[in-house]
Amino acid sequence: MSGNTFGKLFTVTTFGESHGAALGCIIDGCPPGLELSEEDMQRDLDRRKPGTSRHTTQRREADEVRILSGVFEGKTTGTPIGLIIENTDQRSKDYSRIAAQFRPAHADYTYHHKYGARDYRGGGRSSARETAMRVAAGAVARKFLEQRLGIKVRGYLSQLGPIKTDKLDWEQVHQNPFFCPDADKVSEMEAYMDALRKEGDSIGARINVVAEGVPPGLGEPIFDRLDADLAHALMSINAVKGVEIGAGFDCIEQKGTEHRDEMTPEGFLSNNAGGVLGGISSGQPIVASIALKPTSSLRLPGKGIDVDGNPVEVITTGRHDPCVGIRATPIAEAMMAIVLMDHYLRHRGQNGDVEVTTPVLGQL
Amino acid sequence: MSGNTFGKLFTVTTFGESHGAALGCIIDGCPPGLELSEEDMQRDLDRRKPGTSRHTTQRREADEVRILSGVFEGKTTGTPIGLIIENTDQRSKDYSRIAAQFRPAHADYTYHHKYGARDYRGGGRSSARETAMRVAAGAVARKFLEQRLGIKVRGYLSQLGPIKTDKLDWEQVHQNPFFCPDADKVSEMEAYMDALRKEGDSIGARINVVAEGVPPGLGEPIFDRLDADLAHALMSINAVKGVEIGAGFDCIEQKGTEHRDEMTPEGFLSNNAGGVLGGISSGQPIVASIALKPTSSLRLPGKGIDVDGNPVEVITTGRHDPCVGIRATPIAEAMMAIVLMDHYLRHRGQNGDVEVTTPVLGQL
Amino acid sequence: MSGNTFGKLFTVTTFGESHGAALGCIIDGCPPGLELSEEDMQRDLDRRKPGTSRHTTQRREADEVRILSGVFEGKTTGTPIGLIIENTDQRSKDYSRIAAQFRPAHADYTYHHKYGARDYRGGGRSSARETAMRVAAGAVARKFLEQRLGIKVRGYLSQLGPIKTDKLDWEQVHQNPFFCPDADKVSEMEAYMDALRKEGDSIGARINVVAEGVPPGLGEPIFDRLDADLAHALMSINAVKGVEIGAGFDCIEQKGTEHRDEMTPEGFLSNNAGGVLGGISSGQPIVASIALKPTSSLRLPGKGIDVDGNPVEVITTGRHDPCVGIRATPIAEAMMAIVLMDHYLRHRGQNGDVEVTTPVLGQL
Amino acid sequence: MSGNTFGKLFTVTTFGESHGAALGCIIDGCPPGLELSEEDMQRDLDRRKPGTSRHTTQRREADEVRILSGVFEGKTTGTPIGLIIENTDQRSKDYSRIAAQFRPAHADYTYHHKYGARDYRGGGRSSARETAMRVAAGAVARKFLEQRLGIKVRGYLSQLGPIKTDKLDWEQVHQNPFFCPDADKVSEMEAYMDALRKEGDSIGARINVVAEGVPPGLGEPIFDRLDADLAHALMSINAVKGVEIGAGFDCIEQKGTEHRDEMTPEGFLSNNAGGVLGGISSGQPIVASIALKPTSSLRLPGKGIDVDGNPVEVITTGRHDPCVGIRATPIAEAMMAIVLMDHYLRHRGQNGDVEVTTPVLGQL
């Protein structure tokens, strides 16, 4: 499989650069009969794009998705679904200077070494623009998971720089521009962000994604374990530098007696496993957490080099987002949904005949 | 691809349960001309197996690997390499009790829900035994990477429970049973482990893996980014619950000006990226870190349920390893080597190095 | 991999139904630096579409392809290439009758059994319209093969119903509407077709595709042999019912001494192998031949059934093409080019030709 | 995917050369609960190996298969099934002369150009020995298909050189050494073979494979159509040079009114489609036919060249089989079974929820 296709049975193949004519993707393997419309995807796309908070009336990036195939009379046909988002916000800028530079902590240098050249306009394929299609594709998966299986996938910001959230109130998540589930932290986050914006610097973030209602049995050991595929999917998001499942790095200092999630007829007594045991879903909520690095597109000068190896000072002008990590929330939800969709189809196929009478444990 | 095959061009497919007749694997895509013998793999296998420390003369699990194909006159032919390890240490035990139980924090429950049954002897396919083949396959990759490309992949224990290592001295790593690179911490670790063993409890660990000498340009955006594939490979190891690249979760609280690795003609000024930028290797050392959960095979009783849903008290008898995480070091090295090998071939071709002087025949 | 993606390193993923909004595809894995424009693809598309012969000035299906990504400043960047063809010739017809019918020898019945429903407008995804994208993608492969490797892929009609061609003159192939390489047979074919058109019946055809200049060594035994992948690619074209390589079915009655292509320092003495030996290219021209079945879209009534199982008489109205097989010529060329491209990259790497002089940075 | 793995959900990965230590394979994706033992596979293997006819008491190649994993208490567990056949009939011969030669119509030349070297003992990986594992893996698929779905896959010789069979009596197929279904042709075939053996020459053959009881709906358009995957699987068998489905190459001269399989409430009126329509199974018997080339291992001298390009005369000594094509019958059955198994699992997964009330047509 090429690097731009994800999944085995439910596959998502994307194309598009930040300044190309359009972004698009092909979703293959969506079962027939699912009601689907542009609205299903537009909702999630709107959450992702910049300007939703401080500039709610302005739409700088239209991000309007169009369905080109695979849907007939409002339902999926089982044939591939083609999606497209035309790039409208393409300002013609003078990029000639950037063309010859490698900005520190950007993919310029590595893309150049891989391809021998690069589309330097705004980051090209390495730009976060391509994630728009992942969100669109993820919306299809989320709809199927929710409607057919009652699986709910939701994410939230659990940490912005030094500020950690203490409470998890799902209702709060969409009430503020941070996907923050803790109302008490919002103003602190706003102040922090304003300060950063003034400084011209940026900060990282931590996002949690939770999938509830996942039936036990999903995952294909030993290499396509559910947690391994989730790690792959989440680490493939721009700016992600770490992935944890359940207790994650806290496991290091946990005793075995602490860590193990004991089982009673009423349910599991804890969820340090994060919903995945032996690489297979246990029926418990699947809990993943990712670390996003701070953006490197800063107006504060940084040391870079040009294509001939000479030192240059690099400054990024234009719109400045002090914490791009926040915007990863819908993308992380989308990737988790896509992985679960793929695994559901793989399992349902390979073990559809298996009848298990052993009770499924809930959680106390 | 099925769940038991890893990789795109350099693929590893494994089989085998802890108490089956044998473990085995097929390595496909190894370029021709690489000198290879059982010794190359045995070395890494010996490092992995239990008893290397306190019982260096005893070999409870022989773990002797045999090459069945793909090597001729001491060199790989380019055809698939079949490897086998016959299971010799199969004690006939009375497993009937375990058969009907789901041990907490083991894969019993999830395997049962997936397959409707399971080979309950010692964990079956979910047991860590299968990792022996990964180490064997990884040895092939490591040899190629080192001989052909000068790439060195090495791992070490960076944290055992609460004990963190301060120094990194590669020479120390194989001088103690912990893969500990800091001589000053070894006795502390030994004492800690002895205490745990007496308690009957277990603890987690953190392993770091480093690949040096990796050329820039490896990785296939956007889904098969090098870091995404590494995360996949490492998370697929039993007991891994978290993966970080470079600064990892420390990124959350890093400012952009701190995080970015500035570039000068003499080189990069730091390596928070961990050697991967935009999903592609930058030429810097690739640094990954994983969290291993504490083993759940304890003699301290835990609450489980049986196949009918009744509560049972579960005790694991037999050999007790208080920190299985340590043993993941060679496995993590193996997985990183396999990923790099696969990506190298994707970038440069499986036979790109083959030089054939035999004339090409035209047609009369 | 899903059913709508072809290839391992050079992959083509398509979407689109005959009456959907658009057809499209994503080409992933095209190496960077190849000059590419819409014209390169339009040329091959124009050869494929109906109306090129008797109605050369009319364009009923515009089939105008647009490049949406992956090309910058006239050259491929190595990132995915998105292509789109908007469907313009969508007559709003009354399909309600057809919706409930299964036409004999059409995919209606099988699509219904697979998906539980189908887009019945004009054949939906099973229509030959989707092959337009294959031709567009194939044009990219053909350009690379020709420019970089000097490989030429060309096809021609070798038999139309009972009329076999005797001579192979490449110059003739594009001088007539049949892709016929034998000028002496053209008027016979025209007369035959006119008679069929009057009858309202149809006939099959045989197409040969030849690739010259292919270096030896392409093909991945044992399952992805070059000939096996070619057979897959060609059999996947609508209406193909048979594939032969080299002497093909003539081998059955050939003696071993006849069949074998002897070798001398000057070259091979024959090419019964068709350029593939042991599943790997030999350097000889690769010769494949396919059988196309006659179209089933006839105005002559045929027996079908409706969705409830009742007998119906089926008549197809509208444009009638007595030999759709002819139109498979550019599609067969495209598929062969795509297979060769994929195998070349597997053998030699996706970026093996990229030369980067920019210095590699070390670490301070 | 590498070249030595076949399939998407039910995958078969093989290794082994004719003179290596062993042949083996890993079957991944077999659902749990299928009763399986070595006998199931040994039966099909015994049919394949040489010496079954004239030397029924001699076993020159033992071909004893052993199950190493994936089966517990007589049933598959859903985990990978490892199979092994130790190579016992390895005569130590003097191959030094052959090492430097390229025998005409053998894979020597192409393997050399691909890998830069080759295991020249008896053909190495290009030898037909590797097909033994395909037969073993195919036996697993056939058992599942038959037991779970009532699908029967059977093959027979339909033509040996110039001798065509007229009748199809399944009972006859295993009563003679030719897999010939027409008792009246057996002595003619024996005489023909004896003559060939005296001449020292060889001849080709045609094998037909039929799958009955296949439910409609299997196949994944557009690239993984069932017929395309079958063509791939069958063309991957050594010596196959052509594949047809249904009417195959006869389609060329068939009128549309002749070719189409009309449908009535009682069933299809014909089966020119060969059981596949639009790339999806129709419920009709799937009928494929393959052409096998004559073996090139002859004692009659042929012109070859050596590694330096000098002309040499090549003679093959040792056991001589005038028609290797015959032996392809169990291999063709195995490949068809593997393809159907894979597609069943892919379909059952992606469309397991689809309920179709439209009646399934049988055949008149």
From Swiss-Prot, chains A, B, C, D:
Q: Does the keyword Aminoacyl-tRNA synthetase apply?
A: no
GO BP field: amino acid biosynthetic process; aromatic amino acid family biosynthetic process; chorismate biosynthetic process
Q: Which domain of life is it from?
A: Bacteria
Q: Which cofactor does it need?
A: FMNH2
- Does the entry feature the keyword Ubl conjugation, yes or no? no
Kindly list the positions annotated as binding FMN.
125-127, 238-239, 278, 293-297, 319
**A single GO cellular-component term on record:** cytosol
Record's InterPro entries?
Answer: Chorismate_synth, Chorismate_synth_AroC_sf, Chorismate_synthase_CS
Enzyme class, UniProt record, top EC level: lyase
- Its Enzyme Commission number(s) read 4.2.3.5
* GO MF annotations, alphabetized: chorismate synthase activity; FMN binding
Q: Kindly list the positions annotated as binding NADP(+).
A: 48, 54
Q: Which reaction does it catalyse?
A: 5-O-(1-carboxyvinyl)-3-phosphoshikimate = chorismate + phosphate
By sequence similarity, the record places it as follows: Belongs to the chorismate synthase family.
Function field: This reaction introduces a second double bond into the aromatic ring system.
Looking up HAMAP family in the UniProt record yields: Chorismate_synth (MF_00300)
Subunit organization? Homotetramer.
Q: Which PANTHER family match?
A: CHORISMATE SYNTHASE (PTHR21085:SF0)
Q: What is this protein called?
A: Chorismate synthase
Q: Which organism is it from?
A: Marinobacter nauticus (strain ATCC 700491 / DSM 11845 / VT8) (Marinobacter aquaeolei)
